[in-house]
Amino acid sequence: MEMVRPAARRSVGETQPPLPSIYSLTLDELKEWLVAQGEKPFRATQIYEWLYQNRVTDFADMTNLPKRLREQLASSFSITTLKTVVKQTSKDGTIKFLFELHDGYSIETVLMRHNYGNSVCVTTQVGCRIGCTFCASTLGGLKRHLEAGEIVAQVVQVQKALDDTNERVSSIVVMGIGEPFDNYDALIKFLRIVNHPKGLNIGARHITVSTSGIIPKIYQFADEGMQINFAISLHAPTNELRTKLMPINKAYPLPKLMEAVRYYIEKTGRRVTFEYGLFGGVNDQLEHAEQLAELIKGLKCHVNLIPVNYVPERNYVRTPRSQIFAFERALKKHGINVTIRREHGHDIDAACGQLRAKERKEETR
């Protein structure tokens, strides 16, 4: 494992809020702003190309724009840059970034390397309020939502790191710190920006959004008409067990969640992925596999079994590999499409929120 730790960090709240991030503007919003300034709408495409194809961080570098417009942009917007506080590189090529925001809060972003390309896992909130009992992200609670531009900036920052080796980000998973549907408007704007051909041009079917199950937003997301991949953090096959693992299940119980999933499938015609973390002696027995098969029977779906990373602050243990394979076989016996997630960054702080939690501990010593 390689670790890089740059200069000292700011204290939370130490700096003044910056100008609005231009990364938060969709192409249409940027066109509207330009027209209001007396500029031609085509300038928006030029600006997008500078931001997302050339990845400049200074409006002065946008040399095909009139000087007056560059000055207007600089006085109206910022180009969000994230300060790298910690960079951990795993033996398998996974890179975990701890980025510092303008107000001193920190977020995690992960670059995962696959045979088919490079995937970036982005964060949508500083902390999380959902309170899943197995997750490091909820330690310390929710501090604030990220703006769309702060989510976009994570992908841009990772892409800039890949530019040195002529690689590109080929897919995005919205599975980092926070509940994406708890920051819904910023999420949707982020998805439209990174998916736009003039933006980062990541294909919709190469983007996955995961939710713990905020039911009203599932219906709303289904109605958006986006071809984004959709995943549910399920982790339990019964209402009682899911409530123990995920307190959100009290507000949005499993039967109602499954109704929303059925609506999503019927509305979009797309498959849903159920993420199922395996916790030793808790939800990993063959009876749980049978219950899970019954729960999702007949649905257009896929199950992703997740060997969980150990989190010191939590009491859960990893399921033995032999038991994971037995669980997989039990599901396949029922005709369930199932895979075991490949583990990334096992030798670094790979669990979501783990690196940030460690840094928070060090700050308070």
Swiss-Prot record:
Subcellular location: Cytoplasm
Entry GO terms, CC: cytoplasm
InterPro entries: Aldolase_TIM, Methyltransferase_A, RlmN_N, RNA_MTrfase_RlmN, rRNA_lsu_MTrfase_RlmN/Cfr, rSAM
Cofactor: [4Fe-4S] cluster
Alphabetical GO biological process terms: rRNA base methylation; tRNA methylation
Catalytic activity, reaction form: adenosine(2503) in 23S rRNA + 2 reduced [2Fe-2S]-[ferredoxin] + 2 S-adenosyl-L-methionine = 2-methyladenosine(2503) in 23S rRNA + 5'-deoxyadenosine + L-methionine + 2 oxidized [2Fe-2S]-[ferredoxin] + S-adenosyl-L-homocysteine; adenosine(37) in tRNA + 2 reduced [2Fe-2S]-[ferredoxin] + 2 S-adenosyl-L-methionine = 2-methyladenosine(37) in tRNA + 5'-deoxyadenosine + L-methionine + 2 oxidized [2Fe-2S]-[ferredoxin] + S-adenosyl-L-homocysteine
Residue intervals of the Radical SAM core domain: 114-347
Alphabetized SUPFAM superfamilies for the sequence: Radical SAM enzymes (SSF102114)
Domain of life according to the entry: Bacteria
Binding residue positions for [4Fe-4S] cluster: C128, C132, C135
Binding site residues for S-adenosyl-L-methionine: G178, E179, S210, S233, L234, H235, N309
The protein, known as: Probable dual-specificity RNA methyltransferase RlmN
